Amino acid sequence: MTDEETLDPQDWTELRALAHRAVDDAVDYMASLRERPAWEHAPAHVKAHFAGPAPAGPQPVDEIYAEWLEYVRPYQLGNSHPRFWGWVLGTGTPMGVIAEMLAASTDAVCGIYSFVANNYVELQVLDWCKELLGYPLEAGGLLTSGCSASNLIALAVARNAKAGFDVRGEGLAGAPAGTGGAPERLTVYCSAEAHSSLTKAVELLGMGTSSLRRVPADDAMRIDLDALAGMVAEDRAAGLRPVCVVGVAGTTNTGSIDDLPGLADFCAAEDLWFHVDGAFGAWAAIAPESRRLVAGMERADSLAFDLHKWMNLTYPVGCVLVRDAQAQLDTFSLTPSYLAHGEGDRGLTAVDVPWLSDVGFELSRGFHALKVWMSLKEHGTEKFARVIQQNIDQARYLEGLVAAAPELEQALPAQLNIVCFRYVGRGGGGTAPDGAAQEDPDGAARDNAALDQLNKEIELELQERGIAVPSVSTINGRKYLHVAVANHRSRREDFDLLVREVVRLGGELSEG
């Protein structure tokens, strides 16, 4: 008789010892982040370590763990470090680590089956999000892996709700005939500054990239409402069918916030679905001093946002809220016979809370909600609001440092928590911050090209030396250092150091 096998350890004591060590090492790592480089470039031998075939036989767990410590942990993105500001990524929290471990310990599934506590946790978290962001409690919603998924879900609901025909049953080929007899094309509108996930969403929804109308931005990098109105009118006159406008609460490049009340009014007047991509900026709504910045967001038909960005929860967890819960259900609900449920009061398929698999495209879903639930309980919403306001205040502090340094030039005033500036040297160079050309346009172009290259090199030196992690944004054709302040571990002295190092490196690189 063949012995039956399991993937459990033969010696639970050995596993317990490793688990205790792993927890101790993880806590030590988090507690010492400030002492570590902001980022470390993985050397060639680390990359080479991950070549080779899958192991046919077992390896001692201590050796596997040693590989993690030597080859993986030191070479992370660095977003948990206090001086990581290159992109809005969030930094994680210790409670999030514990929550992820607890969820994994039960191999937790969420969103399907009845009388499973995980579902109750997610539904409560969704209600908390609605409450915090001023959304009606009767709205639909779902936790996701992030705003890429959230935007996809929201645009799918918008497409189906506003298409004017049965998209689920007929597909886009079922659209009524437009100009020239071809099926009427559905169109979506967003700012030229809106996130690339919207492009992927319209592609995946079968609408095609050409159906996403990128509207010019104004001088403040917000969607131009007059241009939007003109594009919608022109498309209708050409036989197209506009269905949705996307407003952005915090653009990736500059943190700019579209005129959300204006967009809400426009969509109401034009019978268009109003979606807001609030990936990080939506959370300004919970900070009393800054809530006004995202006023109008609560009027959206759908709202996408992340909790792993400005709420600093462990990756991944995002959310989508849909004002018309039935429209979300109509877009995604599907119950095959092997998942029939909703009868009786006993067993895993009895009448209980709604199955969240009916309001999104995923059936297999992890327990994203636990880290949100535990972290909000640990700190309370008021502390999260204070941290968000702290970041906004730190961005204003950084703006002051930049203004006080004659070698630096800011691209445009920060609307939220992103500051974009560049090193120009004491003599300046290129064009003025408002884009006005200098007297010698050819010389200005040369200066701008040199400054672009110089600021890119400053970015790389800051990263490679482990000093700090900014990124580079292109604004009005010029490159600026991009500092996204969404880090609960950052302190004002970190920004003092950043400015000193930018000025120092700029001077060194200019001379060299």
Give the ranges of each region predicted by the language model.
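Active-site C-terminal subdomain of aminotransferase-like
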Residues: 251, 270, 286, 295-405
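Short beta-strand
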Residues: 409-414, 470-475
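PLP-dependent enzyme catalytic core of the Aspartate aminotransferase-like
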Residues: 443-445, 474-512
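Conserved PLP-enzyme active-site core in the AAT-like
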Residues: 149-329
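Conserved PLP-binding catalytic core of the aspartate aminotransferase-like
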Residues: 410-430, 434, 440-462
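Well-ordered mid-protein domain cores that form the structural environment of catalytic cofactors
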Residues: 94-183, 191, 197-198
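Amphipathic alpha-helix from the class-I
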Residues: 6-8, 12, 373-386, 424-430, ...
